[in-house]
């Protein structure tokens, strides 16, 4: 089964290529923190030889509480992203929440992301597809992996085949998510690159009443399980002070653990992809 290769700059994203790290922070808390986080990701990924894309949100439009921090907004967010790109020369990915944002974001960011909660919103999907940008499609917590085919088709019929799929866990009762490892294989049958968002798979949605809880202590275990499935890359959030992060701190890796964390996953990715394919169907 041929696997499609999606290219951004010199980076090749494919299920049979070395893993790409889509890493950064959950939301742009400040310009200075974004620069700090990106600088550390660049240092670590360059040292380890891992292709890297910086990620962060300019607006968290789906927070549990109306009082929760959402981000700097579209205009200021794009200014911060532009500075990061100039300073570190890295590709950028961020999420889009409304159709009118798609073209604006695509002018700055190399990859635009369709949020999980919005992944069936046809007007948004089509607006994003028509930009021609690479789209990272998050699998909704309420969708089966085979249902992602419909979203891919919407994008393709709008003229865009620069697509990536991303697993971020499935609802399991209230305030809990689980990751079905068999789902990766189902999505890989569509031949597009598949990523694993380990950070958000550790969420406990609404687990702290007005915000999401999480299981940071298990991030390496779950990341290893995902990377063992021959994936195109890992989606990961880190923070210099997760306990005081403005969003999803309980799921975020401590920034000072990034190097040993990624070193283990790079070794695992190389090992898994060195094995010959065994047809078991």
Swiss-Prot record:
SUPFAM superfamilies named in the record: Aldolase (SSF51569)
Keyword Transport: no
Key word Cytoplasm present: yes
EC id: 2.5.1.55
Pathway: Carbohydrate biosynthesis; 3-deoxy-D-manno-octulosonate biosynthesis; 3-deoxy-D-manno-octulosonate from D-ribulose 5-phosphate: step 2/3; Bacterial outer membrane biogenesis; lipopolysaccharide biosynthesis
Location(s) in or outside the cell: Cytoplasm
Family annotation (Gene3D superfamilies): Aldolase class I
Keywords: Cytoplasm, Lipopolysaccharide biosynthesis, Transferase
Stated family: Belongs to the KdsA family.
Name of the protein in question: 2-dehydro-3-deoxyphosphooctonate aldolase
Name of the encoding gene: kdsA
């Amino acid at each position: 089964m041929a696997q499609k290769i999606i290219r951004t700059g010199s980076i090749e994203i494919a299920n049979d290529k070395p893993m790409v790290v889509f890493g950064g922070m959950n939301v742009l808390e400040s310009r200075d923190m974004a620069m700090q986080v990106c600088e550390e990701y660049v240092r670590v990924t360059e040292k380890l030889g891992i292709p890297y894309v910086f990620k962060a949100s300019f607006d968290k439009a789906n927070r549990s509480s109306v009082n929760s921090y959402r981000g700097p907004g579209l205009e200021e967010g794009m200014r911060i992203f532009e500075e990061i790109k100039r300073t570190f020369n890295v590709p950028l990915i961020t999420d889009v929440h409304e159709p009118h944002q798609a073209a604006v974001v695509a002018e700055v960011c190399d990859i635009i992301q369709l949020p999980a909660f919005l992944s069936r919103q046809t007007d948004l999907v089509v607006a994003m597809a028509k930009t021609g940008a690479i789209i990272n499609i998050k699998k909704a917590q309420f969708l089966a992996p085979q249902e992602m085919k419909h979203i891919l088709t919407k994008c393709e019929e709008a003229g865009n085949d620069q697509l990536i799929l991303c697993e971020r866990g499935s609802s399991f009762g209230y305030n809990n998510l689980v990751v079905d490892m068999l789902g990766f294989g189902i999505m890989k049958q569509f031949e597009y690159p598949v990523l694993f968002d380990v950070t958000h798979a550790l969420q406990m949605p609404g687990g702290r009443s007005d915000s999401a809880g999480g299981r940071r202590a298990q991030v390496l275990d779950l990341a290893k399980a995902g990377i063992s499935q021959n994936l195109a890359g890992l989606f990961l959030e880190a923070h210099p002070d997760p306990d005081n992060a403005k969003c999803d701190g309980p799921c975020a890796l401590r920034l000072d653990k990034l190097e040993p964390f990624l070193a283990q996953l790079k070794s695992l990715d190389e090992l898994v992809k060195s094995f010959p394919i065994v047809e078991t169907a």
